[in-house]
């Protein structure tokens, strides 16, 4: 079999080269041909997935983090021709929250799954914003979760722990926001602390944000935290994100829906698959 392998050398702790040295012989020993392309700039993986010639290839692989995977999926969805290849993901980032759902956070195990031809369907969430359409495989966040994502981006030197530390900081800086949320046609106008819509169960580094989520059920799991929740209560809820019991708290509302839209009182940035891309309103 022949594969294209896109490698992001900047992912996580910049261990992609080391991981590549470990996994490439695994493919070669099974007689598979791997064409390795190293990304040179942000958005490069997306361009490659959208524009490369796929003739005679059997799979499109990506070695990187959630941001790299997001780029590959969006590039694949943007192709002008109807060609689609199975996408194989090999973790090389610091979060790799999507691969937690597949129990493939170890790059060797992920490579083995690809070599063994293990495939499965995964939902893709189409997200429409002003002058921009993107596709999500992991999460769409607004409010506090976006604040956390922005802060964590500037704390990459802390590794995976940056998500927890950024969360604690932003909880102390907490502010509520007013918005209209429409879930499967039913509108809710109120104050929110944050809204996060998940395709996957995990976000960040192993947080079970949406414990009922399945990657292929055709539903979006939407978690809403009321704007009136206190900082003390938020801090007490934070540890529960790691076992999924936070959804039983009175300030938390959990929906499973086929679609939703969000219109805040003012336009604000959106967190899509861990990347700060686009602004509200969205649907």
Regions found by a protein language model. Give the residues of each.
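Glycine-rich phosphate/pyrophosphate-binding beta-alpha loops
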Residues: 141, 196-210, 276
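Catalytic core of DAGKc-family lipid kinases
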Residues: 30, 39, 54, 78-193
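ATP/NTP phosphate-donor binding region
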Residues: 1-60, 109
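ATP/nucleoside-binding phosphotransfer catalytic cores, i.e., glycine-rich phosphate-binding loops
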Residues: 183, 189, 214, 224-283
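Short glycine/serine/threonine-rich phosphate/pyrophosphate-binding segments
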Residues: 45, 67-72, 97, 122
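Gly/Ser/Thr-rich active-site loops/lids in small-molecule metabolic enzymes
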Residues: 156-162, 206, 211-232
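Short Gly/Thr/Asp-enriched flexible loops that form oxyanion-binding sites at enzyme active sites
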Residues: 68-82
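Glycine-rich beta-strand-to-loop/alpha-helix junction loops that act as flexible
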Residues: 9, 63-65, 90-93
């Amino acid at each position: 079999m022949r594969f294209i392998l896109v490698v992001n050398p900047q992912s996580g702790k910049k261990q992609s080269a080391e991981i590549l040295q470990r996994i490439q012989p695994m493919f070669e020993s099974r007689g598979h041909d791997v064409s390795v392309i190293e990304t040179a700039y942000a958005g490069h993986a997306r361009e490659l997935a959208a524009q490369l010639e796929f003739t005679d290839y059997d799979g499109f692989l990506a070695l990187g983090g959630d941001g790299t995977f997001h780029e590959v999926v969006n590039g694949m969805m943007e192709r002008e021709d109807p060609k689609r290849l199975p996408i194989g993901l090999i973790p090389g980032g610091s979060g790799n929250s999507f691969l937690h759902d597949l129990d493939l956070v170890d790059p060797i195990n992920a490579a083995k799954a690809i070599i063994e031809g293990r495939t499965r369907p995964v939902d893709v969430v189409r997200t429409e914003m002003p002058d921009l359409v993107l596709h999500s495989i992991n999460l769409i966040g607004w409010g506090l979760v976006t604040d956390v994502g922005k802060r964590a981006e500037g704390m990459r030197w802390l590794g995976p722990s940056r998500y927890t530390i950024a969360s604690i900081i932003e909880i102390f800086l907490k502010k509520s926001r007013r918005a209209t949320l429409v879930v499967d046609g039913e509108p809710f106008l109120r104050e929110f602390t944050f809204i996060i819509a998940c395709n996957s169960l995990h976000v960040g580094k192993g947080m079970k944000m949406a414990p009922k989520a399945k990657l292929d059920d055709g539903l979006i799991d939407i978690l809403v935290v009321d704007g009136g929740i206190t900082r003390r209560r938020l801090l007490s809820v934070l540890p529960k994100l790691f076992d999924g019991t936070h959804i039983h708290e009175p300030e938390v509302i959990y929906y499973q829906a086929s679609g939703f839209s969000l219109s805040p009182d003012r336009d604000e940035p959106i967190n899509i698959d861990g990347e700060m891309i686009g602004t509200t309103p969205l649907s």
